[in-house]
Regions:
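Conserved ankyrin/ankyrin-like repeat signature
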Residues: 81, 114-115, 147-148, 181-182, ...
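Ankyrin repeat A-helix N-terminal signature
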Residues: 72-77, 106-112, 139-145, 173-179, ...
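Bacterial signal peptide processing site
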Residues: 26-28
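C-terminal motif of bacterial Sec signal peptides marking the signal peptidase cleavage site
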Residues: 22-24
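Leucine-rich solenoid repeat scaffolds
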Residues: 232-262
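Ankyrin repeat boundary signal
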Residues: 93-96, 126-129, 159-163, 194-197, ...
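Ankyrin repeat domain, specifically the short helix-to-loop turn at the C-terminus of the second helix
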Residues: 86-91, 117-125, 150-158, 184-193, ...
Length: 263
């Protein structure tokens, strides 16, 4: 009877313990489920949008061109490739080759007008010189690249303190080589020094007379220089003026123009 009483006392305690255990078992799956849900959220694959962004980023990296690629494209006259490089995230527009020639100078050398304009619009330096002291601006003036010169004068700022290897500006060789249209462009622009003297003391006027043949084109160049105020009394390192050369070489028409200018 005593044992029966003890069992009656212990029974509620056992039932209570069983209830606690059962309650714990019922809540356990909920905790596991929550944990699984959290893990699943963390390892979900990237969205389509993020994949697209990643692909774009990789494409940008691939479009970064190596040093020398712009020079190569310009040297080959490849307009589309040049444009593609200029539209890329990173490039060196004034990179140089072993002769210190920039892409722009090479384009001017080759008279590649569309590529030259493309490079100028992208900010290429028209004053940077190579190992023989040619610059895009000086070369365009000296070698009759009239359309290129006109574009430079309209869209950039030539540095008039940068001279060629003979100490001359763009006007002197333009006059000496018979590029009348370049002479007109430079004089109309008014930024070039009309009476600048190079290492030999030559001005554009002296070279147009003393170093050439006195033909019609040089008569027109002399007239253009005089019309724009060229000083005909300046002397070169040998002490001679443009009129001295005209008389010495028998250029009658030019001599007459110079005498009229001096009177």
């Amino acid at each position: 009877m005593k044992n029966f009483k003890l069992n009656l006392v212990a029974l509620p305690i056992a039932l209570l313990s069983f209830s606690v255990v059962l309650s714990a078992c019922q809540t356990e799956p909920k905790q596991v489920k929550t944990s699984q849900s959290s893990t699943q959220e963390k390892i979900q694959p990237p969205s389509t949008e993020s994949t697209k962004e990643s692909t774009k980023s990789e494409e940008k990296v691939q479009m970064t061109f190596t040093t020398g690629s712009l020079i190569q494209a310009v040297s080959e006259g490849d307009f589309d490739q040049t444009k593609e490089i200029l539209n890329s995230p990173a490039y060196l527009i004034d990179e140089v080759n072993e002769k210190s020639e920039t892409p722009l100078l090479i384009a001017v050398y080759q008279n590649q007008i569309p590529i030259t304009k493309l490079l100028i619009d992208a900010g290429a330096n028209i004053n940077q010189q190579d190992v023989i002291q040619d610059s895009p601006y000086l070369y365009a003036g000296a070698q009759g690249r009239t359309e290129i010169l006109a574009y430079m004068l309209a869209h950039t700022t030539p540095d008039q303190s940068v001279y060629n290897r003979f100490g001359g500006n763009a006007l002197i060789p333009a006059a000496e080589k018979g590029h009348l249209e370049n002479v007109k462009l430079l004089l109309a622009d008014k930024r070039v020094a009309i009476d600048h003297q190079n290492k030999f003391g030559y001005t554009a006027l002296i070279e147009a007379v003393g170093l050439r043949d006195g033909s019609q084109i040089y008569q027109e160049i002399v007239a253009e220089l005089l019309r724009n105020g060229a000083n005909s009394s300046l002397r070169d390192n040998s002490g001679r003026t443009a009129l001295d050369y005209a008389n010495q070489l028998g250029y009658g028409n030019i001599a007459q123009m110079l005498r009229t200018a001096n009177s």
